[in-house]
Amino acid sequence: MEKLIFATNNPHKLNEIRHILEGKVEIVGLDEIGCREDIPETADTLQGNALLKAEFVHKRYGLPCFADDTGLEVEALDRAPGVHSARYAGEPTNADANVRKLLEALSSVPHPRKACFRTVIALIDDHGKHFFEGKIEGTIASECRGSGGFGYDPVFIPEGHTLSFAEMGEETKNQISHRALAVAQLRDFLLCAK
């Protein structure tokens, strides 16, 4: 498989995936194939949303495709925002508003405020559907820390670290993140399939 479509319009995710794959697979984003549609995420699970997006692109363009969905699951909030992480503060999506809402919801919760980030990737190719999952445990900080990354990165501190994803820099984050773990599984699968 030489080229693979990544069903996203999110430039941060696209760059992160390309960086993690280190050029071993050519990744093409949706706008590079002329797809400007916002693919609805209406499933109740991360796997379901990833599959919806991958199926949409695969059916429309007939190309091997993968999509991901990521959720931040906070123990004190019964695993919320979870599958609703991107739209936690409502539509349209707004990362800063999502983080503010999360910190407000946790304002009376004592530390450590345990959480995990989960990414599920759905790949559709000529051989069928394949799923890969990455998960990292951590805690939620009291306030935003750092200026790197995107989404909930400024408030998520991975287990075993003292820096938030936003503080630790792209290189370190891309070695340990939930997405990195899922993409490593995808990469290994693709390289074995060659």
From Swiss-Prot:
GO terms for cellular component: cytosol. Gene3D superfamilies: 3.90.950.10. GO terms for molecular function: dITP diphosphatase activity; ITP diphosphatase activity; metal ion binding; nucleotide binding; ribonucleoside triphosphate phosphatase activity; XTP diphosphatase activity. Mg(2+) binds at residue 69. Its EC number is 3.6.1.66. The active site is at residue 69. Belongs to the HAM1 NTPase family. Homodimer. Pyrophosphatase that catalyzes the hydrolysis of nucleoside triphosphates to their monophosphate derivatives, with a high preference for the non-canonical purine nucleotides XTP (xanthosine triphosphate), dITP (deoxyinosine triphosphate) and ITP. Seems to function as a house-cleaning enzyme that removes non-canonical purine nucleotides from the nucleotide pool, thus preventing their incorporation into DNA/RNA and avoiding chromosomal lesions. This is dITP/XTP pyrophosphatase.
